[in-house]
């Protein structure tokens, strides 16, 4: 099955992973330098051993491709993946006069009395982002994260580089180039990002009329994050292949620190008891000339019949 390589990664970490402390204070079991390969001609690699919300993957990728760094677009599409990082901008500002949100990242999980207070403040924050453009401009921006680096890389001369447009043009005109690369890791901008890029660099490769993509990911949350990353870059490969007139080849996923958080171990064990199901199929509709013209409704899956979702806390 298409997701076997992902399941083997999870088993490898449980069996051989090294325990490490981490930035979030949660603790992880991790391995270093792991590679998975997915043949995109065999189906779309969205996990079936648990339900993964494809709508969130679509809206986040389109957000990146728009060059957007403000969560307002995500909230308009009911996507809350990045909420906590923007929320922190607000609750640590001089404008915030609500309940104490110090260390909300852990208190929301560990303190049952605090959890509803946090949820109420987060709802207030989301509502204001959606209805107040000035508030959204001030507190909804995450800094120079993926969209900024992909579409508006800042040069020393004060100009910008559109890496996505450039790499698409290079695939069309110089498909054998070894420079079909997009980087999200800009050392100068890392301090100004809500979260430094986890998926840092990707490269395309054209052979036999097929487009393949390899991602280097410095850090991968294997239970929650990596399934999203696999599907997101598979979708990106499909979108660029369609614009460049190519079939899809492989998605190659290379991970630096691949880890399972200690509070995800039982969930991973549950997932590993399940049998993979047939992979869904991706359909891209609409006669779009550019990857930047796609809307949510243009991207559809068929035949997705996953096992039930498995909940787990996000480490912030």
Swiss-Prot record:
It is found in: Cytoplasm. It comes from Lactiplantibacillus plantarum (strain ATCC BAA-793 / NCIMB 8826 / WCFS1) (Lactobacillus plantarum). Disulfide bonds: none annotated. (6R)-5,10-methylene-5,6,7,8-tetrahydrofolate binds at residues 221, 315. GO terms for cellular component: cytosol. DUMP binds at residues 23, 178-179, 218-221, 229, 259-261. Belongs to the thymidylate synthase family. Bacterial-type ThyA subfamily. Pathway: Pyrimidine metabolism; dTTP biosynthesis. It catalyses: dUMP + (6R)-5,10-methylene-5,6,7,8-tetrahydrofolate = 7,8-dihydrofolate + dTMP. GO terms for biological process: dTMP biosynthetic process; dTTP biosynthetic process; methylation. InterPro entries: Thymidate_synth/dCMP_Mease, Thymidate_synth/dCMP_Mease_dom, Thymidate_synth/dCMP_Mease_sf, Thymidylate_synthase, Thymidylate_synthase_AS. Catalyzes the reductive methylation of 2'-deoxyuridine-5'-monophosphate (dUMP) to 2'-deoxythymidine-5'-monophosphate (dTMP) while utilizing 5,10-methylenetetrahydrofolate (mTHF) as the methyl donor and reductant in the reaction, yielding dihydrofolate (DHF) as a by-product. This enzymatic reaction provides an intracellular de novo source of dTMP, an essential precursor for DNA biosynthesis. GO terms for molecular function: thymidylate synthase activity. Pfam families: Thymidylat_synt (PF00303). This is Thymidylate synthase. It comes from the Bacteria. It is an enzyme of class 2 (transferase). Its EC number is 2.1.1.45. Keywords: Cytoplasm, Methyltransferase, Nucleotide biosynthesis, Transferase. The active site is at residue 198. Homodimer.
